[in-house]
Curated annotation (Swiss-Prot):
The keyword Mitochondrion does not apply. This is Small ribosomal subunit protein bS16. The gene is rpsP. Transmembrane segments: none annotated. GO terms for molecular function: structural constituent of ribosome.
Length: 90
């Protein structure tokens, strides 16, 4: 099963709110997911990002591929750097 870490759109029309979820790559964007690991609110100034770092690192270690936007969010939170350092430490 190919697993992706991606955004699931929530919220009202013209007022998006996203959940960062781990899902099978074949499931629809807003469909079934395996685990919710955070939230992202781009409407707030500045944008609110809350991610469970431990869960994100666990899924990245298990081979889950983040989408481009999620990769940028992880980089801004310092999660990608920690993941790369842990891979080099092996």
């Amino acid at each position: 099963m190919a697993v992706k870490i991606r955004l699931k759109r929530m919220g009202a029309k013209k007022s998006p709110f996203y959940r960062v979820v781990v899902a099978d790559s074949r499931s629809p964007r807003d469909g079934r997911f395996i685990e919710e690991i955070g939230t992202y609110n781009p409407v707030a100034q500045p944008a609110e990002v809350k991610i469970d770092e431990e869960a994100a690192l666990k899924w990245l270690g298990n081979g889950a591929k983040p989408s481009d936007t999620v990769r940028n969010l992880f980089s801004s939170q310092g999660i990608m750097e920690k993941f790369h350092l842990s891979k080099q430490g092996k």
